[in-house]
From Swiss-Prot:
Protein name according to UniProt: Catechol 1,2-dioxygenase 2
Entry similarity comment: Belongs to the intradiol ring-cleavage dioxygenase family.
Cofactor: Fe(3+)
EC identifiers of the protein: 1.13.11.1
Species of the source: Acinetobacter lwoffii
Keyword Oxidoreductase among UniProt keywords: yes
């Protein structure tokens, strides 16, 4: 079919609407369908390829991996770059860079003031201590900002999704003090991979790509009257630090990490400072 015939078919489909519907939804869906029709024609996509793709998306949805696919195909990073561009055009600059949320946030984590311990004490990973501070765009510290933190355990698994972990393990919300400061104790997370037999890895194999993520810690930072920040920090030295399958590593999000002796416990702790 030529594009004129395709456009005529699309118009027939659009004309079948029995009421106005939602204009924005119609605009988006019609554009996506048009581009897919063009793709099928241009690449001579066969019926078995089309139905294989459709069934694949159904399987990915049932297994809860659509969020991983969105990250792995670069959609989340693309959305971040678009927001960066919009802010730059509006004259907004500076501050901690944003990066992807990922699909593993869980609302309702316990709230602490100033400091929190994220782990339940059973994880054998190395101790991690992080201290940070939240500032407004004017450079003044923000008191009572909410810092939500979550990360994987020493096996690369997240509580709630990993039923062997207690509820909200390695997940906390911390309110900053009068000087905008917060801190937490946890364990050093490790990098992990998408499920090796899952739908995401199945597609990545077809694309000749890996599904590894470097060790990282997720953050939401919010305060009344300010834009909510969604970001992560990465643990320096991870072999996939700059080869993240989700494209989340960004300059400014790899803080210095150093080892420090914890004398009372006779242990070594990793400390992170984030201004």
């Amino acid at each position: 079919m030529n594009k004129q015939a395709i456009d005529a078919l699309l118009q027939k489909i659009n004309d079948s609407a029995i009421n106005e519907g939602n204009p924005r939804t119609k605009q988006i869906v019609n554009r996506i369908v048009r581009d897919l029709f063009y793709t099928i024609e241009d690449l001579d996509v066969q019926p078995d390829e089309f139905w294989t793709a459709l069934n694949y998306l159904g399987d990915a949805g049932r297994s809860g991996e659509l969020g991983l696919l969105a990250a792995g195909l670069g959609f989340e990073h693309f959305l971040d770059l678009r927001m960066d561009e919009a802010e730059a055009k509006a004259g907004v600059e500076g501050g901690t860079p944003r990066t992807i949320e990922g699909p593993l946030y869980v609302a309702g984590a316990p709230v602490s003031d100033g400091h929190a311990r994220l782990d339940d004490g059973t994880d054998p990973g190395q101790t991690l201590v992080m201290r940070g501070r939240v500032f407004g765009e004017d450079g003044k510290p923000l008191a009572n900002a909410l810092v939500e933190v979550w990360h994987a355990n020493h096996l690369g698994n997240y509580s709630y999704f990993d039923k062997s972990q207690p509820a909200f393990n390695l997940r906390r919300s911390i309110r900053t003090d009068a000087e905008g400061k917060y801190s937490f104790r946890s364990v050093v997370p490790v990098g992990y991979s998408v499920p090796p037999q899952g739908q995401t890895q199945l597609l990545l194999d077809q694309l000749g790509r890996h599904g590894h993520r470097p060790a990282h810690i997720h953050f939401f930072v919010s305060a009344p009257g300010f834009r909510k920040l969604t970001t992560q920090i990465n643990i320096d030295g991870d072999p996939y630090l700059w080869d993240d399958f989700a494209f989340a590593t960004r300059d400014g999000l790899v803080p210095a990490v150093r080892q420090a002796e914890v004398r009372k416990a006779n242990r070594t702790a990793w400390t992170v400072s984030s201004r």
